[in-house]
Amino acid sequence: MSMQDPIADMFTRIRNGLSAEKEFVSVPFSKIKMEIANFLVNEGYIKSCSKGTTSMGHPSIEVELKYHAGAPVIEMIKRVSRPSLRIYKSHADLPKVYGGYGVAIVSTSKGLVSDRKARDLGVGGEIIGYVA
């Protein structure tokens, strides 16, 4: 059976791994998911990510989850724009997640950036998801 929304699946795997207090989570590989994983590393929400392979030989992304004092660093990770309903915003209309505490992942013409950086660059785009 094919996966309808691979990014939502990635977010769910991360959320489930955090609730089960796992150290690593394996996600099927795609370029956009690797970009999102690198974004989460740069923003400090996960420790690291690397490309690997499953036992079946399929490419995957190994995500090392991050905890602080035993609690997950990611309190909330949520998919916003989805295949059946894409959400696009201009730089002026980009939302502040948790009053600026969290970050919105925005896909722009300048690549995958945070809502703060998109506002600074003056570009809008598709809101992939929220992380806090």
UniProtKB/Swiss-Prot annotation:
The UniProt entry, under SUPFAM superfamilies, shows: Ribosomal protein S8
The biological processes this protein is annotated with in GO are:
translation
Record's GO cellular component terms? ribonucleoprotein complex; ribosome
Q: Which GO terms fall under molecular function for this chain's record?
A: rRNA binding; structural constituent of ribosome
Note the InterPro entries from the entry. Ribosomal_uS8, Ribosomal_uS8_CS, Ribosomal_uS8_sf
Which key words tag this protein in UniProt?
A: Ribonucleoprotein, Ribosomal protein, RNA-binding, rRNA-binding
Q: What domain of life?
A: Bacteria
Give the family per the record: Belongs to the universal ribosomal protein uS8 family.
Subunit comment for this entry? Answer: Part of the 30S ribosomal subunit. Contacts proteins S5 and S12.
Function, in words: One of the primary rRNA binding proteins, it binds directly to 16S rRNA central domain where it helps coordinate assembly of the platform of the 30S subunit.
What is the name of this protein?
A: Small ribosomal subunit protein uS8
The UniProt gene name for this protein comes to rpsH
